Amino acid sequence: MSDTDLYVPLAEGDLALEPLAERHRVGLRAACAQDAEIWEIYPFSYAGDNFNPQFDALLRSQPVRRPYAIHHAGTVVGMTAWIEHGAPGWSIEIGNTYIAPSMRGTGFNDRLKRLMLDHAFACGLERVGFKVDVLNTRSQAAVRKIGGVQEGVLRRERRTWTGRVRDTVQFSILRSEWEARQS
């Protein structure tokens, strides 16, 4: 599997993922501004004055992080990314995900993750990981809902932009587990 196989536009109905580019800046800024409080439990803040520096860093983060703009019916409603995790061609992480409040609780995130997981496993990957702040119980529940298996808690794994030292819950889904859920 090559990067050109994995990091491609993906779409299903009104849901589309496009590799993040400068043209997404304004739409993503507007989406991120819809929930200023959520950034307290993220490693980085995309709110207010933090947005432009974080967006610029995200654009420069390849090849380790391959970010997408998430579209619903043509409107940018968030972001997500493939993140190198483990052996290239074997394992990848889905992370850096933010979805605007209007799309939460609608099944949109479930569709998004299914689209990405289907694609990752179709590209030949064996494992997809997820790292979630221990305080982010909504995201933990979402990962469990799609079949993520909790592998453990990485204690004091990183310092967030607020200075808080976070514990991180590690999840994964294996190809065999995903295939069993789909049959």
Description of each model-found segment:
Residues 136-152:
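Conserved active-site alpha-helix within GNAT-family acetyltransferase domains
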Residues 53-91, 95, 101-102:
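Acetyl-CoA-dependent GNAT
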Residues 122-132:
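Conserved GNAT acetyl-CoA-binding A-motif
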